[in-house]
């Protein structure tokens, strides 16, 4: 019996274990950290052996294949040992893809992934399609394939997931943008990171579709190095040669495979970056053949995504916005660009090799104060203090919200859009956003 060992006992690892067992493999799950109770129960219910707080070498190194959770870097000592002995290492998505014939709509990019993925899922669901949501959001693809299979899956893919995918194929691949992010995981080399994103094209044929942002210079450069076999569907802000999704005279326009228009003002998502997300999602729906009235309705009633430019409430006529999902400079830039009132910006967390220079002119133009929130804020002081804005240094969310409350004047906006990962002070970016919302609502 072939032995599969799964490194990481979270959503993706536990789901992969259930599918592997269903397909007749000898399965073992190992996690260096603690495994959460719901995942322990899932593994126990299926009589799958697991360990936490350690990696037992003799139980791992004898695997025929390893399924690695995306959060584990290739530099991890156990992963290095496995690579040295030549054991194949794949992702949960790669594994799940072997056991389903469902149509896969896959979304990647540095920013906008979750919003675009959620919007496509919303459109497909509204159209009555049998669809699952998976990857970085939703439930484990492997668990859905094992226990509640669907005809379509809408999958958000990070570069980490794409790294360990080899035979998997997207029927519809979407590449939103490529800007520096996670460089700490790619030897601080932007080329390596960009290359990982382009893996979304692998194994595609003429029968498949590739949707991408035509105005992104990095995508344009990368595409020159890659043979694209799929039908291409570029989108851009304005109508230009070859572009099939754009805005023309304030009309949101899809030109292929069928023509569709609606007023831009009816789109539920606002801001320039969300326009691109809406174009990508509309093209995916159009390719699948969803009726235009459903596309229109879904684009106009989509409620948005938690922790992404989420309006919390107004206190003393100051609007508080939770954009905790902005874990890189580009995401923060887009958030700031969409602000229409003087803004107090909350920055900070675990730095991922950020270059803050592109942000400086916009911060100077839009911001009336800065609040730094992190275990170590020195790099923020070094980059932003010279702008001459009022600055407050905080090391907890309660101190941060208190500082914002004291600084903000009626008519202004407080924006949590930190540019950084959350792991220095919080469990994750959701925890950061939830703490912010709770404290703001208690002001």
Residue ranges and their predicted role:
Residues 26-32, 210-214, 346-347, 366-375:
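Short internal beta-strands
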Residues 20, 66, 107, 136, ...:
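Residue-level signal for inorganic ion chemistry
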